[in-house]
Amino acid sequence: MKSTVETLSPTRVRLAIEVPFVELEPSLKKAYREIGQQVQVPGFRRGKVPAVVIDQRVGRGTVLNEAVQEAIPQNILAAVREHDLKTLGRPEVEITEFTDGDSLNFTAEVDVRPELTLPDLSTVEVTVDELKIDDSEIDEQVQSLRERFATLKTVDRAAGEGDFVQIDLNATVDGEEVPGGSASNLSHEVGSKQLLPGLDEAVVGLAAGASTTFTTQLVGGDHAGRDAEVSVTVRTVKEKELPELDDEFAELASEFDTMAELRDDVRERVTRGKRVEQIYAARDKALEQIVEAADVPAPEGVVREEVESRKTAMVDQLERIGASMEEYLAAEEKTEEQIDTELNEAAVQGVKIQLLLDTVADAEDVQVSDDEFGHEIVHRAQRAGVAPQQFYDQLVRSGAAGAVYGDVRRGKALASIMDRITIRDAAGEPVSLDALRAENEAEHAHAE
């Protein structure tokens, strides 16, 4: 096999590969063997059909085509190794010349990792918001906890904001019932805007047994975009009874004996959450700054594949919740072109960051231990709700284990970046990663 490489851009090359016919012999033998297992010829056992008979039955061209398709990836891989290329995505192959008995000539265009010049990471400095905790934020968290322990009490009055109502609904368009537009005994919190637009306004002021109608625009189904007349009947009205914020509540709702201890714990958790937000903000700003300084290009083919992957994931997620892309677009008040633009922008930045982290990992010779890889497998298996070994086996079968390994390696490269940059808040005070790590370790130790 002979090969040459032509640089088309900083992120794309064209390989020109010539494979002598004699080097195709192993692929030809394999093609004859596999085709021989599939055809039935009287007088011959399956798999024992002579090549000349196979040529007569299916044609020599069919065998050659199968051999070529099997040989091309192998020779691309050999050429990639010969020229020490770091390829990305799938190659685009074009056979330029091939006849029976002569050399196979083809080209393969493929995206490659660009050569990047990294800035001195120790000179990178980012600024994030100050860590400020207001008492109102603590009050909000405590109130949220209080709401979780509320009880519902039936009342003999009209429904108001924050009440829970049991309702019956029936929707019609032009006097005809909407398929799936009826429901009985639904529980709804007034003011939550969880169901139909206009429902909250309609039920305010209605007591048990009262009915009314309102108009709403349908976002899904055969009548999407049309106005529907909806009748609603209130069965019951219930109000929330909140527990008193005293030491008894602290014992009920937490591991603490007093409200003072509970509030202190809430403050610590809010503080930790804001520290995490600071670090995330610092991470995003640092990566954006370094990507710009390193002038990281985004290979078009890789970006295209990433956009397709993200859009497929979006559609799958919508299907899991029983929604369509059309319904999503209506709810977000966006066009498909706007969604595509957003996906493309996110994909471009994501690909640039991935290339940057790979370069940092190479420059610092980042390694992933078996324990680190295994921990990631366990973590992902838990999120997927399957056993770790089953999850790993699925990765191996799908050829995705290497991608997970790459993610772990990039994560370690990112951690290295974060350790070397300078982070300050808006007041000029340094923001330390060590404090957050110590808190997390202490929390994990306490949980164990």
Curated annotation (Swiss-Prot):
It comes from the Bacteria. Residues 162-243 form the PPIase FKBP-type domain. It catalyses: [protein]-peptidylproline (omega=180) = [protein]-peptidylproline (omega=0). Its EC number is 5.2.1.8. Pfam families: FKBP_C, Trigger_C, Trigger_N. InterPro entries: PPIase_dom_sf, PPIase_FKBP_dom, Trig_fac, Trigger_fac_C, Trigger_fac_C_sf, Trigger_fac_ribosome-bd_bac, Trigger_fac_ribosome-bd_sf, Trigger_fact/SurA_dom_sf. One of its GO terms (biological process) is protein transport. Belongs to the FKBP-type PPIase family. Tig subfamily. Involved in protein export. Acts as a chaperone by maintaining the newly synthesized protein in an open conformation. Functions as a peptidyl-prolyl cis-trans isomerase. Consists of 3 domains; the N-terminus binds the ribosome, the middle domain has PPIase activity, while the C-terminus has intrinsic chaperone activity on its own. PANTHER family: TRIGGER FACTOR CHAPERONE AND PEPTIDYL-PROLYL CIS/TRANS ISOMERASE, TRIGGER FACTOR-LIKE PROTEIN TIG, CHLOROPLASTIC. This is Trigger factor. It comes from Salinispora arenicola (strain CNS-205).
